[in-house]
């Protein structure tokens, strides 16, 4: 998104992508109204909505064998007309879409199979990166390479961490006739599953107590636990043939103390790793990208970029990041961890989250966003 906005504004930009494509399993896929507004700002909302997606207007859960609805998300008729709703869209499709639109601009270059290995320095100033494909020099390097950012690791920037009581085991199960037509959570004492509707399959997030993700044991025993939690999965679990059909995510909630150094700016998960709770990660990353473009385009155009501009991006985006992370940590410690440890009855969890003032936070965070960004950069073409 950041590269698209720069190229759209007439700024030359090179994107280095580690892989040959964006087809990574179990990436973020929840697109909030704040991101939908941004797509509308740049005139791409109608084309974006032609991608496969599912609308989300409420939260459903199975706490006792029955599927129940809890917590409506903002989805009035007017909001539908203005595309202000939440949807689930596969991130590889989203990234391919943005890359395709960016490639319309001559200022945009995407180099695939180019893994960044180090920074190029002149004194303390970052002047480019070295990759497996080539060395690239730039007025500013934007690190948007995720929670395991190689650029961040090479930068020497310091991280401040928040504790997380959980890890996630991701896997997919094919949908069967009669399955629910909505995403939902399965809540049992000692177990939490998020069943994400992905069209012809379920993307399943199995939340685990921290540090237990690698203690896999018997796959058959694991499948039996899933069926015990939700008997309707009896046929679905046959789609798991080996542990290689699963992917372990070490959940971290952390952020850089300083997002920049001369010539370098970190955004998205490279600046602040988020918990998967709430599906906010991709939306905060897009907001970072838009804010960075709004602040950096003019100094890049005039050759007046300074540390002040990089610091301004952090100043703009740090507060919403801290607020969302604090809420994620609160939910992890006071709702998710007690269910996983067996201390909280799962049937009580939705009512805990629904208590005032917690019940007002999801609609505000999802519907309006915390310090929402709008595109102010021009299209010079």
What are these language model-derived features?
Residues 32-101:
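Active-site-adjacent segment of FAD-dependent monooxygenases/related oxidoreductases
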Residues 5-27:
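Glycine-rich FAD pyrophosphate-binding loop
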Residues 294-381:
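C-terminal helical "tail/cap" subdomain of flavin- and related membrane-associated enzymes
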Residues 258-276:
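Short FAD-binding loop at a beta-strand-to-alpha-helix junction that anchors the flavin cofactor
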Residues 124-251, 255-256, 260:
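Conserved FAD-binding catalytic core of PHBH/FMO-like flavoproteins
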Residues 112-125:
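A conserved short coil-to-beta-strand element within the FAD-binding core of flavoproteins
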């Amino acid at each position: 998104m950041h590269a698209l906005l720069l190229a759209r504004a007439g700024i030359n930009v090179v994107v280095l992508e580690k892989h040959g494509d964006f087809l990574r399993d179990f990436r973020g896929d929840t697109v909030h109204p704040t991101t939908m507004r941004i797509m509308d700002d740049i005139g791409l909302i109608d084309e974006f909505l032609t991608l496969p997606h599912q609308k989300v207007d409420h939260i459903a859960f199975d706490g006792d064998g029955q599927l129940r609805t809890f917590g409506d998300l903002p989805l009035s008729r007017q909001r539908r007309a203005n595309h202000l709703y939440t949807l689930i869209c596969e991130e590889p499709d989203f990234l391919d879409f943005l890359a395709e639109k960016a490639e319309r601009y001559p200022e945009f270059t995407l180099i695939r199979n180019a893994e960044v290995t180090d920074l190029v320095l002149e004194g303390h100033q970052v002047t480019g990166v070295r990759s497996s494909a080539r060395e690239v020099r730039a007025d500013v390097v934007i690190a948007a390479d995720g929670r395991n950012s190689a650029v961040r690791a090479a930068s020497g920037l310091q991280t401040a961490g928040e504790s997380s009581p959980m890890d996630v085991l991701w896997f997919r199960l094919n949908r069967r006739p009669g399955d629910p037509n909505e995403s939902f959570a399965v809540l049992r004492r000692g177990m939490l599953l998020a069943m994400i509707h992905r069209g012809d399959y379920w993307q399943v997030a199995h939340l685990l107590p921290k540090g237990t993700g690698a203690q896999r044991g018997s796959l058959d025993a694991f499948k039996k636990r899933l069926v015990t939690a939700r008997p309707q999965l009896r046929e679905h679990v046959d789609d798991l043939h080996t542990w290689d059909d699963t992917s372990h995510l070490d959940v971290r909630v952390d952020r850089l103390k300083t997002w920049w150094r001369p010539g370098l700016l970190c955004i998205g998960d490279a600046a602040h790793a988020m918990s998967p709770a709430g599906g906010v990660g991709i939306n905060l990353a897009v907001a970072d990208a838009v804010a960075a473009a709004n602040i950096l385009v003019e100094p890049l155009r005039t050759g007046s970029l300074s540390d002040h501009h990089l610091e301004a991006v952090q100043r703009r985006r740090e507060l919403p990041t801290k607020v969302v992370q604090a809420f994620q940590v609160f939910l992890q410690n006071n709702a998710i961890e007690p269910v996983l440890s067996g201390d909280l009855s799962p049937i009580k969890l939705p009512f805990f989250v629904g208590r005032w003032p917690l019940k007002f936070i999801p609609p505000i965070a999802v519907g309006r966003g915390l310090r929402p960004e709008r595109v102010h950069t021009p299209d010079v073409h």
